[in-house]
Structure formats: C-alpha cells, structure tokens
Amino acid sequence: VLKHYDLESKIITIDIDSKINISCDQQLMMIVFDNLINNAFKYANQKISIVYKQEKIIISNDGSKIENKDINHIFEPLYKADVSRNDTNSTGMGLAIVRNILDLHNYTCKVVQDEEVHFIIEMNK
C-alpha cells in the first residue's frame, strides 16, 4: 500500500508484530488500509505511524484533530468533517467504505485522539 505515497515527505514509523495472523479478504482490506493511510498522509504534519499488535492495527498521524462534534459521524456516507479538514477532492465516502468493509469482517474501527489522531482497527473474534 505504501508504494503509492511520497514516503520522503513524512516521517513514517512501522511497528508490526512478527506473528501476524489475520483472516480477511485481502483485496477488501487493501481498500481499508489505502483509505486510512491516504487520510494519514493527507492530514499529517510530519509523522505517521502504522502499528500492529495484539489484534489491533493503529494508523496514526500528527495532523489537525477531528472536532468532537464530528467524531461520531465521520464513518457516515457523504459526511465531511469541519472546513479545516475538508478536501475539495473528497467525496465523503472513504471512511464509510472502511466501516462497511470492517463490518463484513466483524472488525471495528474507532478514533482516539491525544497529541495524534489514531484510527484503531480491532479484529474481533
């Protein structure tokens, strides 16, 4: 997935457990990762991290935060967050597609924010 991005424009950290065993439709999950990583590149100031451990995939960036009023809606079709995060090329469908694909796999995605914005995929069994 990362080969499509300008890797020199950001500081990227990847931390993957050596024992990965994910049961999924590979093509659909590539769409999920592409959407989340694309958003990370779009909104990051400098840092992006991709972490896999303990049945969780966490894609984080150090960009602008998502307004609290938007958090519960960003996975809805056609929803676009506040103006500072809006992209004229955005359809508002990316995160809705992510949610639908994850639902098909019985996985969940939530957003947690501290100094960074973290999209956390939990692979429920």
Feature annotation, model-predicted:
Residues 66-79:
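Short conserved segment of the HATPase_c
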Residues 29-30:
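A residue-level detector for a conserved hydrophobic packing site
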Residues 21-24, 85:
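Conserved micro-motifs of the catalytic ATP-binding
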Residues 47-56:
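Short beta-strand/loop element within the Bergerat-fold HATPase_c
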Residues 11-21, 53:
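Conserved catalytic submotifs in the C-terminal HATPase_c
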Residues 46, 106-107:
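Conserved glycine-rich
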Residues 40-41:
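Short helix-loop "hinge" at the ATP-lid/N-box region of the Bergerat-fold HATPase_c
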